[in-house]
């Protein structure tokens, strides 16, 4: 396809000096860890700049022609900021000018990201958090950004998610847009500024379900309420390929074909829900199918590939930097080949491996990736659950339930819930072991390929826990099974102290089967259309129910569900 934008995130170089915490928030540049109090630490700036140069060299050679950089808040000064903050911003501006100049010299277009709305106490006091003043402040910020950085191609705006609970520093973003009407007011102001400067506004439709705007990414009514009669050649919509985050087992969102605005479709190379690049999780076979589908989309003008951004984890490989992942780089390369050159997934993979390791048997590598695809789809996911379309309030329920980021959950709550949706339980157990056998075949093939067999052994040991856990989820419980699982986990933790967190708790949770059925029947639906009970109860009063849910989930769900990202509370807003 001849597209205008082959966009990739450029967040990885910033972590070369700041990923020494136990858990890393990969969703944003860790600005506070780059600073020395007065501004950017000069020594860290040198390291980041060198890594950035190498990164740009690699991705432009690969064929990407645009990058995204965090963020507008750290590049725009305001008179009501204290002098110390404006001096710090000035140091960022000087540093970013060097990055922008280098990227532009390499033929890259640069887009600066921003949330609506980034805040601190000075902004809050200045606007009083009145919508009209917030919009004016945002418009003024965009105008100053383009005035001071004329080489930028535009900005990328996120409205449906804000900074994680762990984000520290001079700015934290907050969700301020609650309705389609409010969203239109903000967009009109930003589009007006973009038109004045001939810049592009890339508006991301990603939402987490908070407030009435929270179903924008999948609900056509909300989508049209926001974008209809909002024509502009300077407005591009950026949409994820499905109705939820970067998971498998999704059909393409029909909203990609709605309306008349140009589109960028988002894909993920560093699989935040599938190991963060610690084992092979090839996206090519799925993305080839999506590419065929998107050939019929006349509004498509680009793709956006996430190669480092996304998720919270202690896995710290940096794409195209220190200890980069072969599997992430494979996905980065193959995604571009599939969409730009209409290359098949198999050919894209063999092109990549033959360039990286000349003389490699391409057919064997493809067989290896087919086995990896089977292992992920049939053991990492539980197919019978993953294919079900479930909705809670304004959110499409993810097709992956007992695994999240770098944590595997094995407990009675998960067992009770997952059994509600999986009825072919014996087959699920058997399918899991067949998929585990595929990893064993991968290990044998890896010995004949330029692949680190230790990575595949790590994958096998991780997937082995999942296979045995299925016996607990879907089989009859007995004490010997519990001991067997715990022996596996203990040995795994000993051999892989930096491996996945495995949280196992076999203590029974007391709630009746009839109660589970009633709760799910009330709260979940199998179609996107809202029911009467959704409109009258769940969409209006769920925030009042949340305190009760919080008491329940403190005893039954791991603490990371409360402490990472925006916290589970966002689903009830």
Residue ranges with predicted function:
Residues 1-10, 15-17, 48, 147, ...:
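Substrate-binding groove of N-acetylhexosamine-processing glycoside hydrolases
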Residues 1-160, 195, 291:
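Feature activates predominantly on carbohydrate-active enzymes
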Residues 40, 84, 101, 129-143, ...:
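Alpha-helix capping and helix-coil boundary motifs
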Residues 74, 116-119, 161-164, 207-211, ...:
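Short, internal active-site loops enriched in acidic
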Residues 77, 165, 247:
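Glycine/Thr-rich phosphate-binding loops of Rossmann-like dinucleotide-binding domains
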Residues 121-123, 165-167, 213, 276-278:
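A generic structural signal for short coil/turn motifs at secondary-structure boundaries
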Residues 125-131, 161-197:
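Active-site cleft segment of glycoside hydrolase catalytic domains centered on the general acid/base Glu
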């Amino acid at each position: 396809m001849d597209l205008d934008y082959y966009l990739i995130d450029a967040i990885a170089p910033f972590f070369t000096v700041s990923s020494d915490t136990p858990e890393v928030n990969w969703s944003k540049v860790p600005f506070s860890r780059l600073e020395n109090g007065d501004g950017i630490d000069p020594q860290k700036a040198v390291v980041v700049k060198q890594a950035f140069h190498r990164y740009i060299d690699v991705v432009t050679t690969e064929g990407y022609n645009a990058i995204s950089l965090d963020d507008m808040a750290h590049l725009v000064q305001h008179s009501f900021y204290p002098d110390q903050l404006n001096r710090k911003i000035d140091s960022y501006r000087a540093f970013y000018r060097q990055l922008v100049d280098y990227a532009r010299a390499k033929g890259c277009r640069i887009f600066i990201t921003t949330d609506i709305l980034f805040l601190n106490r000075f902004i809050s006091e200045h606007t009083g958090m009145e919508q009209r003043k917030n919009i004016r402040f945002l418009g003024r910020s965009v105008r100053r950004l383009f005035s001071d950085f004329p080489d930028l191609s535009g900005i990328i705006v996120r409205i449906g998610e804000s900074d994680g609970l762990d984000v520290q520093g001079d700015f934290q973003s907050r969700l301020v847009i609650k309705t389609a009407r409010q969203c239109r007011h903000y967009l009109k102001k930003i589009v007006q500024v973009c038109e004045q400067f001939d810049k592009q506004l890339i508006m991301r439709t990603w939402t987490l379900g908070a407030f009435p705007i929270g179903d924008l990414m999948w609900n056509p009514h909300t989508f049209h309420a926001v974008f209809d009669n909002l024509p502009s050649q300077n407005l591009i919509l950026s949409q994820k390929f499905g109705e939820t985050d970067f998971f498998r087992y999704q059909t393409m969102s029909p909203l990609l074909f709605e309306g008349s605005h140009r589109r960028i479709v988002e894909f993920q190379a560093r699989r935040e829900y599938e190991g963060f690049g610690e084992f092979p999780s090839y996206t090519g076979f799925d993305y080839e199918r999506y590419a065929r589908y998107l050939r019929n989309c006349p509004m498509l003008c680009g793709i956006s590939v996430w190669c480092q951004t996304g998720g919270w984890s202690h896995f710290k490989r940096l794409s195209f930097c220190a200890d980069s992942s072969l599997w992430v780089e494979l996905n980065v390369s193959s995604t571009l080949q599939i969409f730009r050159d209409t290359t098949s997934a198999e050919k894209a993979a063999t092109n990549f491996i033959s360039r990286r390791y000349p003389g490699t048997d391409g057919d064997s590598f493809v067989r290896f990736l087919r086995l990896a695809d089977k292992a992920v789809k049939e053991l990492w996911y539980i197919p019978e659950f993953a294919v079900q379309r479930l909705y809670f309030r304004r959110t499409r329920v993810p097709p992956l339930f007992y695994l999240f980021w770098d944590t595997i959950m094995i407990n009675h709550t998960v067992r009770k819930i997952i059994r509600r949706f999986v009825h072919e339980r014996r087959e699920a157990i058997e399918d899991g072991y067949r998929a585990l056998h595929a990893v064993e075949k991968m290990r044998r093939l890896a010995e004949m390929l330029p692949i680190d067999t230790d990575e595949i052994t790590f994958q096998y040991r991780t997937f082995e826990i999942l296979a045995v856990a299925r016996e607990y989820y879907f089989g009859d419980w007995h004490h010997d099974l519990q001991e067997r699982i715990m022996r596996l986990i203990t040995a795994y933790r000993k051999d892989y102290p930096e491996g996945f967190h495995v949280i196992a708790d076999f203590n029974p949770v007391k709630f009746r089967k009839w109660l589970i059925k009633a709760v799910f029947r009330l709260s979940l639906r199998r179609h996107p259309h809202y029911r009467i009970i959704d409109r009258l109860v769940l969409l209006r009063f769920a925030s009042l129910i949340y305190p009760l849910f919080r008491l329940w989930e403190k005893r039954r769900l791991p603490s990371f569900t409360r402490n990472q990202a925006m916290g589970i509370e966002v689903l009830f807003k």
